[in-house]
Each structure stands twice: as C-alpha cells, then as structure tokens.
C-alpha cells in the first residue's frame, strides 16, 4: 500500500495514474499509518513545487525534488503545474524502481492530441519532438509514433468541415492500466 499526501487534490488522479504505471495493482491510503510501503507527497509553495517520497517515516534527500521555475503566477496554470509535478514524480519513480516508461509521464491523455494540436498551430515536427521530450520525457519511438499518427489524422481531417458538421467519436481503450 502506498500513502498519498497531496496538498492540492486536483492533482491526485494524475499522480495516482503515474504511480499505477510503476506499481500496478497497489492500493492507496490518504493518511499516515502503519504498514505502508512508502508515501508520496506534493507541496505547492510560494516559489516552488516539491515532490517527496517518504520511506520508513523519513524523507531522504535523494528522493526529494523541487522545481523553482514554477512561480506563484504559474501555479494558476493547472496544466503547466500538473506537468511539472508529473515530470518530477516520474523522475523520482524511475530512479527508485529502475524502470522507464515509453510514454514518460504521459497518462490520461491521447498522445496524438498533443502532437496534432501543435501541428495545427504550425509547429515544426522537430519542435514538437523537443516539447514532448522535455515536458513528458517520452521516448523517441513514442514521440515519432504520435507525430506520425497526428500527421495522418491532420491529413484526413483537413478536407472535412468538422467544426460545423457532425463528428462521431469511437472510444477505444488505449492503456489497460488506466481504463
């Protein structure tokens, strides 16, 4: 069982999905109690976001990360703050477990949506690659795959007037660990 001590609950689902990638099948507690393997904690401060992993009641320095690039004005941007928290948790969990996930810290979103949005905004493929590598720590293979699929999707959607017409969305589960 893993303890979740999260200062702002709006990030709990994102953190739990990331933990599920590294520790499938684990259960979670929202309080300090005996019998937990370890705790994960987020702290949103005035000048930084911190994430910690607590083991045996102590928070070793090796499992604490802070990102001071996230200033208070940026904390109002939920998406940017979430990405910083998830990236820091991913780095800590990868170091702790020795595992790396091919999609990096990406959970709960269709990866091609990120690439497609940027292609539609006129971004170059190399800029999308850099963004996905820096923001989500995704592998080169998965970044290439998402850009390739997004380019195909863009080509299919360009001749359609999908903004004023009708769309049919068929949801197909992508990741069995979160669906």
For the regions a language model picked out, list residue spans one by one.
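A short, structured N-terminal alpha-helical element that caps or precedes a catalytic domain
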Residues: 1-102
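Short, charge-rich amphipathic segments
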Residues: 8-17, 47-48, 60-67, 124-144, ...
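N-terminal [4Fe-4S]-dependent radical SAM core
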Residues: 93, 97-100, 120-168
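N-terminal alpha-helical segment
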Residues: 108-111
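Canonical Radical SAM [4Fe-4S] cluster-binding loop centered on the CxxxCxxC motif
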Residues: 165-179
